[in-house]
From Swiss-Prot:
Record: residues binding ATP: 30-33, 51, 87-91, 415, 496
InterPro entries registered for this protein in UniProt: Chaperonin_Cpn60_CS, Cpn60/GroEL, Cpn60/GroEL/TCP-1, GroEL-like_apical_dom_sf, GROEL-like_equatorial_sf, TCP-1-like_intermed_sf
Enzyme class: isomerase
Name recorded for this polypeptide: Chaperonin GroEL
Keyword list, A-Z: ATP-binding, Chaperone, Cytoplasm, Isomerase, Nucleotide-binding
Organism of provenance: Pelodictyon phaeoclathratiforme (strain DSM 5477 / BU-1)
Reaction equations catalysed: ATP + H2O + a folded polypeptide = ADP + phosphate + an unfolded polypeptide
Pfam families in UniProt: Cpn60_TCP1 (PF00118)
Subcellular location: Cytoplasm
Length: 547
């Protein structure tokens, strides 16, 4: 077992703080409309330029293992916030740093860490409730565009593009982001369907960067039973291989020998194939497989209908323009089914919706309807260089995620002002002792930090002056860092999704509390590399310079 290095008490917390500060200081320069870019060196290719907090956080790995632990804990704040809400990663990092910094001061002064944590937890609960109280729902295209613009680092073109996409396929419709062949960024709506089943094996992946399996112009086998015997599957595999087109297999499951054989042939390059489980369960699964068959112009191979897998021919297979499969979802784009058949199926489902007496059944039927009729909106992102395209694509994906969050939970005033307005929720927080009261005050101070940092990044205005003026105001009044004017921020389009602000605070408080209550830190002892003496030239002694 490797030897361990252990630090205790204030020594451990001090080292962790150095790591927290190093990461947070690199991330927080990107906050707000006046935030700066961070340049990240890559082992291969050109450096990456980004203004996305989580991208910066993910690149940071420190040489000191204790400092690195602190940095990785805060990186978790940014990653979790990005996963849940799509934006707010820099805000979350700034909040985590502020809570930890203020908490450490009080721990050093003799406060009990566990009571500080309880106070912080109670304070966060009340602030989150206050954020919900001041949140407002969004519906209009203009409001959706505003959220998209802010989340895409104040790029109105991206905001408008996302609003158009949501307008065309609905707020719950499927929207994907792809790299364009040229320089133009455009929206394209294509008929398609997405269901929540990913690939059965990561060996099916064709794009290792995105971990997707991408099949162009594939054939689609739709089978309603498990496939465990390779003999059943072999005839149709041979026929699809002869056609030269990739194959998507949708079945209840593929087990053992059959899956292993498919994977081996995929790795050898004999087959271009991907396998996924069928969506849904029971009767709903049968209906969804039928939907896929109608959309792609295929036939569900079902023994109930008298079809057997070993007798299947190419004519039974569905077809599509493209299929993308990740670990969680399968998206079928440009199904080659007949327009009349698809329309008839849509009308049939609409009839079932009208007759349905169960809310759950109605919801599931409407989901199927959206998948058949809503289509997929594809945002093709163009740019002059690959570096710019990757950065822009990442911003669009973040903005799309954040816009969906805004549709779910509504919006609050942006620019760090919502957290200032939510401070009044702390008046409801009840403390059992002085240390818990201190925990509540730590949150009161930390909630001011995002606004201070937004102002600091402008480089022209005193943060303390702005903070006092914003505190003196009410409602949507705040400081617009883009124009450096005091105004109604909602009317100026400066808004944040409530979910983003809430997630940032909850995740920051969670990780900062763990760090505050840490009493020991353990890492592996670094092994010293021994310097081997170089062999003298001319071979070994007595060997006459043999080489």
């Amino acid at each position: 077992m490797t030897a361990k290095d252990i630090l205790f008490d204030s020594d451990a917390r001090a080292k962790l703080k150095v790591g927290v500060d190093k990461l947070a200081n690199a991330v927080k320069v990107t906050l707000g409309p006046a935030g700066r870019n961070v340049l990240i060196d890559k082992k291969f290719g050109a450096p990456t330029s980004t203004k996305d907090g989580v991208t910066v956080a993910k690149e940071i790995e420190l040489s000191d293992p204790f400092e690195n632990m602190g940095a990785q804990m805060v990186r978790e704040v940014a990653s979790k916030t990005s996963d849940v809400a799509g934006d707010g990663t820099t805000t979350a990092t700034v909040l985590a740093q502020a809570i930890y910094r203020e908490g450490l001061k009080n721990v050093a002064a003799g406060a009990r860490p566990i009571d500080l944590k309880r106070g912080i937890d109670r304070a966060v609960k009340e602030v989150v409730q206050e954020l919900r109280n001041i949140s407002r729902s969004i519906s209009g295209k203009k409001e959706i565009a505003q959220v998209g613009t802010i989340s895409a680092n104040n790029d109105p073109v991206i905001g408008d593009l996302i609003a158009d996409a949501m307008d065309k396929v609905g707020k719950d419709g499927v929207i994907t982001v792809e790299e364009a062949k040229g320089m133009d960024t455009e929206l394209k709506v294509v008929e398609g369907m997405q269901f929540d089943r990913g690939y059965l094996s990561p060996y099916f992946v064709t794009n290792s960067e995105t971990m997707d399996a991408e099949l162009e112009d594939p054939l689609i086998l739709i089978y309603d039973k498990k496939i465990s015997n390779m003999k059943e599957l072999l005839p149709i595999l041979e026929k699809s291989a002869q056609s030269g087109r990739p194959l998507l297999i949708i079945s209840e499951d593929i087990e053992g020998e059959a899956l292993a054989t498919i994977v081996v042939n995929k790795l050898r390059g004999t087959l271009r194939v991907c396998a996924v489980k069928a969506p849904g369960f029971g009767d709903r699964r049968k209906a969804m497989l039928e939907d896929i068959a109608i959309l792609t112009g295929g036939t569900v191979i079902s023994e109930e209908k008298g079809y057997k897998l070993e007798n299947a021919t190419i004519s039974y297979l569905g077809q599509a323009g493209r299929v993308t499969v990740d670990k969680d979802n399968t998206t079928i784009v440009e199904g080659k089914g007949g327009a009349e058949e698809i329309k008839a199926r849509i009308n049939e489902i609409k009839g079932q919706v009208e007759k349905s007496t169960s809310d759950y059944d109605t919801e599931k039927l409407q989901e199927r309807l959206a998948k058949l009729s809503g289509g997929v909106a594809v945002l093709n992102i163009g740019a002059s260089t690959e570096v710019e395209m990757k950065e822009k694509k990442a911003r669009v994906e973040d903005a799309l995620h954040a816009t969906r969050a805004a549709v779910q939970e509504g919006i609050v005033v942006g620019g760090g002002v919502a957290l200032i307005r939510a401070i009044k929720g702390l008046d409801r927080a009840i403390a059992d002792n002085e240390d818990q009261k201190t925990g509540i005050e730590i949150i009161r101070r930390a909630l001011e930090e995002p606004l201070r940092q937004i102002v600091a990044n402008t480089g022209t205005t005193d943060g303390a002056v702005v903070l006092e003026r914003v505190k003196a105001g009410t409602g949507d009044f705040g400081f617009n860092a883009r124009t450096e004017q005091y105004e109604n921020l909602v009317e100026a389009g400066v808004v944040d999704p409530t979910k983003v602000t809430r997630s940032a605070l909850e995740n920051a408080a969670s990780v900062a509390s763990i760090l505050l209550t840490t009493e020991a830190a353990i890492t592996d002892v670094k092994e010293e590399k021994s310097d081997m003496p170089a062999m003298p030239p001319g071979g070994m002694g007595g060997m006459g310079g043999m080489y």
